[in-house]
A protein has these predicted regions:
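Transmembrane alpha-helices and adjacent helix-loop boundaries
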Residues: 1-254
Length: 254
């Protein structure tokens, strides 16, 4: 027990110190760690759908894209530049706070996840995988071509002039100076992503042994037996799709 506690403490210290060491070799190394943390969050969200509920979702990255575009639209002047009526209300763009974007990204992705799950409730295995793969490809094509007749996503060019993330007045897009020591912007992002990953791990850990988590695992092992035991498999599947997608949406917004 003492050995496990020591390992946890050493691991926590290593994770906290890692970006400070990496930034001495260049910000590119810290940026790799940033992206890795986002992929960890994506994997944890996907694990809810595939690992807990046993639903082979190959279009999961679509929720990542939706979260990214949501943040891009809400933290840039693109909508004001495209729609005159919108520009009259917000001449400089929305520039929405991260504290608002995160729950919105989670809700939007969860709604899309449930929307994807609804027509696939009776599909299993390879058939479910093919449908979800098609969904992911549809979203990619849709976003790439949503620049006409009304320019919403700016097509393959993407959205520009997106704000850096601000938290309680701290601009993560700028280096932070503490005395003679400077913490780079990418390192600040690292700690934000690390905090979100820890939150995701806690939620997933709590779900695993909860009533919902056990219901998902029962469906994964034998859906017919789970239904015979009184589990509402339809609602549980939709919940798995929605909850898993919400983590992908938040990761994309980052």
């Amino acid at each position: 027990m003492k050995s496990n506690k020591t390992n946890w403490i050493i691991g926590a210290i290593a994770v906290l110190v890692l970006p400070l060491i990496l930034q001495s070799f260049g910000n590119a190394w810290v940026r790799i760690a940033d992206v890795a943390l986002l992929y960890v969050m994506l994997a944890l969200g996907l694990n809810i759908v595939v690992g807990y509920a046993g639903l082979l979702d190959l279009g999961y990255v679509a929720f990542y894209a939706m979260g990214a575009y949501l943040f891009g639209l809400m933290a840039s002047p693109h909508l004001s530049d495209t729609f005159p009526a919108f520009a009259a209300m917000f001449p400089n763009g929305l520039h929405t706070s991260l504290l608002i974007v995160i729950p919105l990204a989670a809700v939007l992705a969860a709604a899309l996840g449930a929307l994807l799950g609804a027509p696939t409730l009776k599909l299993r295995g390879d058939y479910l995988a093919i449908v979800t793969l098609g969904f992911g490809e549809i979203i990619r094509i849709f976003l790439n071509n949503l620049d006409h007749p009304v320019n919403i996503t700016n097509g393959p060019k993407g959205l520009g002039q997106i704000d850096s993330i601000r938290i309680f007045g701290l601009d993560l897009g700028k280096n932070l100076n503490i005395g003679d020591f400077q913490i780079s912007s990418v390192t600040l992002y690292y700690y934000l992503f690390l905090l979100l990953v820890i939150g995701t791990v806690v939620v997933c850990y709590r779900l695993q042994d909860s009533r919902i988590g056990r219901a998902w695992m029962a469906i994964r092992e034998d859906e017919i037996a789970a239904k015979a035991m009184g589990i509402n498999t339809r609602n549980m599947k939709l919940l798995a799709f929605g909850m898993g997608a919400s983590f992908g949406g938040v990761a994309g917004a980052m």
